[in-house]
Amino acid sequence: MHKAVGLDGRRDPHRVLKVLQEIDADIVALQEADKRVGGRGSTVPHELIDSHGMYKPVHLGVRHKRVFDKARKHAARLLKVNTRNIGWHGNAILVKRHVGVLDCAALELPTLEPRGAVIAELLIGDNPLRVVGMHLDLSGLWRRRQMRAILEAIDRRPQKMPTVLMGDTNEWRTEAGCLKELNGEFHLAPTGPSFHARHPVATLDRIIVHKDLNIEAAGVHMSAAARRASDHLPIWARVTA
């Protein structure tokens, strides 16, 4: 969501929520949802999400500890700061009000620059579902390491459940690079190119679904609002057990 800054150069969180309302998904994974400087607060304020009423953030309860590590002599003061972020390294998961949150976790990924992923274990009706939101590196080598780390983290989770990975993989290829790490356990939703929003030619954004789940439909949301809201178009998939 490009920190809520659209192609017109304006930061407009209302526009982000308008696009989410158009898509009307039960579960949303956002990238670049938090600021990179200062307290790293959310670019879509908590109060705005609450007043909008459609979604609730999955609260990870973590702080960006690297901010504090770089200023250890001020750590006591900094730890009192409410960062007001909704994610981890910019990754956030929003769910509709009827979706239950069983557990969640923030992952620190191997990287040369700050990168992370978020895990939410959810309950939709009687059906459990694990969702991973991610934003992988620009480097192909580090993307593969990061995807491997995410899959290993999933394997370590105490509860086994169907899993969907969503986010910006930064992978231009369809059957190579970090996607080879999936080893046939997952399949890619046929969403289509989502980058750049002005003229989408690259399928950088992916919805990756475990083979135990079915993909009923998938695509790219290409409304006028979506084309203005970010440099990436949102993608979607309808998944069933």
Where are these regions (language model features)?
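Surface-exposed patches in mature extracellular/periplasmic domains of secreted proteins
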Residues: V58-G61
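Active-site regions of metal-assisted phosphoester/phosphodiester hydrolases
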Residues: M1-I27, K35-S42, D50-S51, Y55, ...
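Residues lining the SAM
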Residues: Q31
